[in-house]
Structures are given as C-alpha cells and as structure tokens.
Amino acid sequence: QLYKVLVVTDQKTKDKLYKESYYQSQIRDCSHLFIFCSYKNVESKHIDEFIDLMEQARQADDERGYIDKVKSKAKIMLYGTIAKADIGRRDKAEALHWMQKQCYLAVSQLMVACADMRIDSCPFEGFSTEAYDKILDLGDKNLTSTVLLPVGYRTEDDRHQYRTKVRKPIDRLFEEKK
C-alpha cells in the first residue's frame, strides 16, 4: 500500500481545489473528497512499515504452533525482500507509475463500496496535480496527488442524472482471444 488517502470535508479547502479542478462542480459539492496520493519516491521504510503491520496481524493468531509461526515469519521476510527488490529494479518514473496504478486499484474498491451503500462517486483525473500538491502541502511529505474521488448524494435537480450514459457496446469493448 504505497499510497496515502486524504479525506477533505472542509468547504474552504474544497473551494480552493475546485478552482484547480477546472471548475468541475463535484469537487465543491461533494460531502467528502478522497484524494489518493502516491509516494514520489518509495523507500525501504515504506515496505518495512507494511511488513511490520503484516507481522503484527499474523502474530495475533495465537493458535498456531511454533513451527507455523516461524514459517509465517520467514514468508513475511521473503515477501519484504522480494518487494524491495522489485521496487529497486525500477527507475524512478517506472516506480511512480506503478505506485499510481495502486491508487487506481484502491479507488475502484472505494467506488464499489460507495455503490453498495448507494452513495454516488465520480473518479477524477481532471485537476492540476501541481496545484493540489501545493494547496495540500504534499511536497514535504514525499506525496503527489494521483486521482480524486468525490463522494456524496446527488441533488434531485442534478440535470446529468437523467442523461443517457454513453458507453461502447459490449461487442466492441470486449474481444475474446482464443
């Protein structure tokens, strides 16, 4: 989980971000604005933090025997070594691209959760990353804004809710390869 999620509910902050989102109303009107931020540079400590969390979670299972605990610890250590090696082989741009894709996976899960609760959400890329990073003071935190997800309930007078959604037909979107 080489990303961080900021949750903005403050209207003044949303108003500032609205201007840097090409005046798209969902940014200003949402109840919660989730901003998924990827690290600009991955460091060993980020992986170590996750490994520590994994180890703590696995130690909570007191019913395992000693051998199982040793095997589990070895697997966790191996996972950490592999993760560090995988990130280490990538150049900075490739690592950033990979971390940004992790944000999109998380956004999709939040969208599914929102839909399950009948809360509207709308993923956004249309914003100035540089401006968001400055407004949210992300520069000193080794983070950069990657993708936005405003969530909330639409108003009854939302004129877009009745417009026909335009999507590619299934037969043009999916192609079976044998």
Locate predicted features.
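Acidic, surface-exposed loops and disordered segments
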Residues: 1-178
